[in-house]
């Protein structure tokens, strides 16, 4: 799991049927965690731009979304209210 900040969103008008109704957000990992690539993650918790989030990846992302058959690589599974050394 990684910690990141929501920096934008992606609109997809055509997608797999089991992804319809999901919101896609762009997440930037926290620089202090040494991860420098932005990712697109399915948002199941209603995160907003600027919020710090928890992102599950791989099969954990699919299970976290409640759809183990969906073609999902990353999912926002939590919003961080507070934490130490996050920025």
Residue ranges and their predicted role:
Residues 1-32:
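N-terminal first-folded block
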Residues 14-16, 42-44, 64-67:
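A generic local secondary-structure boundary/capping motif
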Residues 54-87:
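C-terminal structural segments of small proteins and small subunits
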């Amino acid at each position: 799991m990684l910690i990141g900040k929501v920096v934008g969103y992606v609109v997809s008008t055509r997608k797999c049927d089991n992804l319809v109704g999901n919101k896609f957000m762009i997440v930037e990992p926290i620089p202090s965690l040494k991860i420098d690539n932005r990712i697109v993650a399915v948002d199941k918790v209603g995160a907003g731009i600027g919020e710090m989030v928890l992102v599950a990846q791989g099969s954990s992302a699919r299970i976290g979304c409640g759809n183990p058959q969906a073609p999902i690589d990353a999912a926002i599974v939590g919003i961080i209210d507070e934490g130490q050394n996050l920025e």
